[in-house]
Amino acid sequence: CALPILIHSIGRNRPGTMSAWIERRIFPGAHPPCLSEMMQIFEPHSFSVLDVENLRLHYARTLAHWLERFEANADKVEAMTDSAFVRAWRLYLAGSMASFTAGDLQLYQVVFTNGACNDMPWTRWRLYNDTRSSKEKTWNPVTS
């Protein structure tokens, strides 16, 4: 089995452009893809998608923690930069948190491989349980 590869990417539900403000102030040149755009890259190269997971609510919570810590240190940040920087990042963190919470932005994790990968668990049981004592077995149609 070829080693699986993980792509972890902020994305969106449909093709589109970034907000002009984010493009100009925060992430120049960034493009959060939708899943169909990601698949267009995989398909010509015969990559097999093994798993797709959306962690948008996890990321919304992460952004909430970042915003809380940013606010607790805003005076220090402003002393190192300026008030415009603090306002921009406050808006970015709060706006992003709202976008992930509302489902306008996504956080995709796509696992793929460049060949037949049959020696893998059937379920996600291993993700939610102690894998050191895992009762789940892998199923390989070639050897089973």
Predicted features and spans:
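Short, small-residue-biased leader/transition segments that mark boundaries at the very start
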Residues: C1-L3
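Substrate-binding/catalytic lobe of Class I Rossmann-like enzymes that use SAM or dcSAM, i.e.
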Residues: I10-M120, Y128-N129
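Short, cationic low-complexity segments
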Residues: W125-S144
